[in-house]
Amino acid sequence: MTAQNTFDVIVIGGGISGLSAAKLLKEKGLSPVVLEARDRVGGRTFTVQNEQTKYVDLGGAYVGPTQNRILRLAKECGVKTIKVNEEERLVHYVKGKSYPFKGSFPPMWNPFALMDYNNLWRKMDEMGSEIPREAPWKAPHAEEWDKMTMKQLFDKICWTSSARRFATLFVNVNVTSEPHEVSALWFLWYVKQCGGTMRIFSTTNGGQERKFLGGSSQISECMAKELGERVKMESPVYKIDQTGDMVEVETLNKETYKAKYVIVATPPGLNLKMHFNPELPPLRNQLIHRVPMGSVIKCIVYYRENFWRKKGYCGTMVIEEEEAPIGLTLDDTKPDGTVPAIMGFILARKCRKLCGLTKEERKKRICEIYSRVLGSEEALHPVHYEEKNWCEEEYSGGCYTAYFPPGILTQYGKVLREPVGRLYFAGTETATEWSGYMEGAVQAGERAAREVMYEMGRIPQSQIWQTEPESVEVPALPFVTTFWERNLPSVGGFINFLAASVLSVATAAGMLAYQKGLLTRS
């Protein structure tokens, strides 16, 4: 289409998902336009460049094996990946003490805690295996699990306080919310569609294995450059009107665009900023009121030298202390060893609690906990500090992703990506693989673009959903479990076994005593 402001498809949102959709449409000979509310592309990815940091990812940054779509895009853009350092030991900080370790999860020396931890991960993966990626509301136990919070599930399956405490951190780290806030069905689905508990939490061979050299915003900027003037910045969408032959979209700056189809590539809750004519269907209208965003402040502390590596630590800290602002850290030093830095997340309840502090106060508290965990005075003397509070972002509403409270997924989940007339829905929340990550954003954007192409008669329906070949540069390795990890009983199972054993021994002893005449009938 050549008329001014008239296109084949309007894409709302210039993050990775929206740009992926527009890129694919353009490659297939269609005419898309991208309307982005901010003065930049990238959405929940945000790379800042300055003298102190060279560059720093204040938003989405991590990528790993099985995230093949975002890796393909990066390769097309000439963006290389670098491994997050995990050569030295990690540190688990609990009850005021630091415990160095190697591997994905901290080891447990208490046998009851070990059984409890092992059963927790095994149980979550077992439950997740029942949940269909494409339709979690169709799981055999969907209704039961959706009425339950993750806190209720943890209370049900965990016997020890240490397992419950770490399980809470596991939810905080992965979805920036609290166990009492999220549906068990939704969280179990979320972990499953990321490849399971090991894949989602691990650095090496997991979701945090790598970053993009030069920052993740390069990928959005590369796609935007390819689209050229089709990307309109500072164009928040105010109104979507489907009543005419063409869909009309109006922005806050009073620009009007027309197209045959529209792809909405924003977090679901941001649909509330748009006025729809005709009104959205009842379930879609209620869905967008019911899926809040997670809460996180991403913090990067810079130091004169990499003192933690000199002490034999890689920079990863798993911190279990209520007063500590940070729950998880990763090394953020540049691959050539320059600009030594530690990245940490202020998560969920702690994010909400510490939002009221000044930036300087947050930095001070972060440095203090790093000093205690690493046992180093040097941690108290940073040379620079960067942070990004995603809760204050008007056009994100939070990070990393939207979460589903109890009861929502089974009642409203089926309309999450269901088209409304000529409106189609993208955004990482609508993905079925690595939802919440950059990978999910690409899958969702390209799927929505293919839905439009199918509706236009350009592709068969069978081509809407497509698998992605594995990345050659970043292959996925299987996680190998030991015999004991597969067969170690839960605490409850062990207690039942002991009780049954004691009962059996007592019964056998009684029978023997009776046979020998040691017991007589009265």
Swiss-Prot record:
EC id: 1.4.3.4
Membrane-crossing residue ranges in chain numbering: 493-513
Keyword terms: FAD, Flavoprotein, Membrane, Mitochondrion, Mitochondrion outer membrane, Oxidoreductase, Transmembrane, Transmembrane helix
Signal peptide start-end: none
Entry keyword annotation includes Flavoprotein: yes
Site positions for Important for catalytic activity: C158, C367, H384
Family: Belongs to the flavin monoamine oxidase family.
Membrane side Cytoplasmic: residue ranges: 1-492
Record membrane topology: Single-pass type IV membrane protein
A single cellular component GO annotation: mitochondrial outer membrane
Modified residues (S-8alpha-FAD cysteine): C399
Main location: mitochondrion
Record field: catalytic activity: a secondary aliphatic amine + O2 + H2O = a primary amine + an aldehyde + H2O2
Topological domains annotated Mitochondrial intermembrane: 514-522
Pfam families: Amino_oxidase
Locations listed in the record: Mitochondrion outer membrane
Protein name: Amine oxidase [flavin-containing]
GO terms, molecular function: flavin adenine dinucleotide binding; monoamine oxidase activity; primary methylamine oxidase activity
